């Protein structure tokens, strides 16, 4: 019986440890304002902690999400991110926020967040959103959202949003990491540096190599 209890405790500890490693580490202090220099700091979760005596209220403050940003001509959208890089007080807190402005028929093209799940809130307009599950099913979950609607994108899965209304749209999203990361699928595959061999991509996508080379010219980084 004691042996069973000991094994049960070990199993629970193993599960707990695996879950804790699946998200940003928990903070062991009230806050850890992120700084990029080691002077008077302690390295925690990718950033140095600012000396608590030097922390000010501005370290926990960001302004600008009330402002609409002009859409990117290529995608028709613009993402304003609030993460540990521009709000250092988020360091070790495991959260971040974005505002997404969509032009008419603009889109936030297929992408993933390798380190975070996302909950999206539609503030203005109408969006068609969705995500695709992993292999082998690659099942699409999609829905048209209206003002006040909320949708969740699981961590790591490819997802997208498209403005299907006749007017600009605005959405806000919370993410479960201080620095969730973004991998935009088309940019990554066709705009890599150095470029992936077109013949390989042509075989992978089962298209003519000329099509791949044309796509690579559209996504190449300046």
UniProtKB/Swiss-Prot annotation:
Disulfide bonds join 32-49. Glycans are attached at residue 78. Pfam families: Cupin_1. Gene3D superfamilies: Jelly Rolls (2.60.120.10). Belongs to the germin family. May play a role in plant defense. Probably has no oxalate oxidase activity even if the active site is conserved. GO terms for molecular function: manganese ion binding. Coiled coil: none annotated. Residues 63-213 form the Cupin type-1 domain. It is found in: Secreted, Extracellular space, Apoplast. This is Putative germin-like protein subfamily 1 member 9. It comes from Arabidopsis thaliana. SUPFAM superfamilies: RmlC-like cupins. Residues 1-22 form the signal peptide. Oligomer (believed to be a pentamer but probably hexamer). Keywords: Apoplast, Disulfide bond, Glycoprotein, Manganese, Metal-binding, Secreted, Signal. Its main location: secreted. One of its GO terms (cellular component) is apoplast. Mn(2+) binds at residues 111, 113, 118, 159. PANTHER family: GERMIN-LIKE PROTEIN SUBFAMILY 3 MEMBER 3 (PTHR31238).
